[in-house]
Design a protein with these regions (language model features):
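Compositionally biased alpha-helical segments
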Residues: 23-177, 181-184, 188-196, 200-204, ...
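Terminal, low-structured helical/coil segments at or just beyond the last alpha-helical repeat
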Residues: 222-225, 265-347
Length: 347
């Protein structure tokens, strides 16, 4: 009797351990709501969706696996999973490395429903690519975009961002002439896009013109005019839409001013008998001064301090930018593509 009792206890412990391990290893299923054409709805955990057939459980512990299909099944709405929420919080905090790992995990976990609209596998894959772009890993972005399945996207802004990736791919390849053709072509000229996307377009174009100007004849100083205008368009697109790109544009613009021989001469002759306020170099020095003042007034220097060569522009100027007229950007409040879809277009 004692031996039998011991065996019974051991068997119970064994099956308890097996059940616990199985429960722990079972992947999280997407929680959703099945919407039927007759008005009914059922909250459930979706196992898969293929060819119009949804396979699901009514709860995670249920052993009953059920199926429903079109036309009785009209749509499936998904609740936001915790892993996606965590990933988005990291993303908005600019912690792109950890956010990308979470998005990748979410993408794999919910792959079985990636053919449905607004599924979290497709959304996670999209934001995984955004993490690569924002962190500057264009090689990773290129590889991820090649494998990406976009069918589950429903927002126009997401599809627009996929189109803008064409510019980033050209940046990766350093195909500056192609970027110039894209930016000035019929597809984008005059096209209304949200500020978050407009900043990307203008920055890629400005970067391309910058690189093309470097290849031009040094004696032709006029070649920098279009570059300066292009970087100014980045700054005017929306200073809070994509802070990282705006900072790069501002610093590149000040680099151009600092390297300009006319500006250097204007600095040398500042407040001397040789000063020529009507010269092109003097006018550019005033532009550089205004930009440096703006950079500090809006708080950009708190995110990325001005280097000494650019801060010296503050010593040369006649007009001061009023602090009250400028709103400081919040570096941590950069809107994402999804939120931008809900905002009015800036262009």
């Amino acid at each position: 009797m004692k031996i039998q009792s011991i065996l019974t206890v051991l068997s119970s412990v064994y099956f308890l351990c097996v059940s616990t391990v199985a429960a722990q290893s079972e992947p999280e299923l997407p929680k959703g709501r099945l919407l039927y054409s007759d008005g009914r709805h059922v909250d459930c955990y979706v196992i898969s969706y293929r060819a119009g057939v949804a396979t699901y459980r009514t709860n995670m512990k249920s052993l009953n696996i059920l199926q429903t299909k079109k036309p009785a099944l009209e749509a499936i709405y998904f609740y936001e999973p915790q892993i996606f929420t965590d990933a988005m919080n990291l993303y908005r905090a600019k912690n792109y490395g950890e956010a990308k790992a979470k998005f990748a995990e979410c993408e794999v976990s919910f792959k079985s429903v990636d053919s449905l609209p607004d599924n979290y596998a497709t959304l996670a894959g999209f934001y995984k690519m955004e993490c690569s772009r924002r962190s500057g890993d264009l090689d990773a972005l290129s590889a991820e975009l090649e494998k990406y399945r976009k069918d589950g996207l429903t927002r126009d802004n997401h599809y627009l961002q996929l189109e803008v990736y064409t510019f980033w791919e050209a940046v990766r390849l350093k195909d500056w002439a192609r970027i110039d053709r894209l930016a000035t072509g019929d597809s984008w000229q005059g096209r209304k896009v949200p500020s978050e996307l407009r900043v990307q377009l203008e920055y890629c174009h400005a970067l391309a013109l910058d690189e093309l100007a470097k290849e031009g004849p040094k004696e032709d100083s006029s070649r920098w005019g279009p570059v300066i205008n292009a970087y100014n368009r980045v700054l005017s697109a929306d200073a809070t839409a994509s802070i990282d790109l705006v900072l790069k544009a501002a610093n590149n613009l000040m680099r151009i001013y600092a390297e300009d021989e006319g500006v250097q001469l204007a600095i040398k002759n500042w407040k001397t008998e040789h000063e020529k306020v009507s010269s092109v170099g003097y006018q550019k020095l005033m532009e550089a001064n205004t930009l440096a003042q703006f950079y500090k007034q809006v708080g950009f220097h708190e995110i990325q301090p001005l280097i000494t060569d650019y801060e010296k522009f503050l010593n040369y100027g006649q007009v001061k930018v009023e602090t009250a007229a400028v709103t400081k950007p919040d570096a941590g409040a950069e809107p994402d593509v999804e939120k931008a879809a809900e905002a009015p277009e800036a262009e």
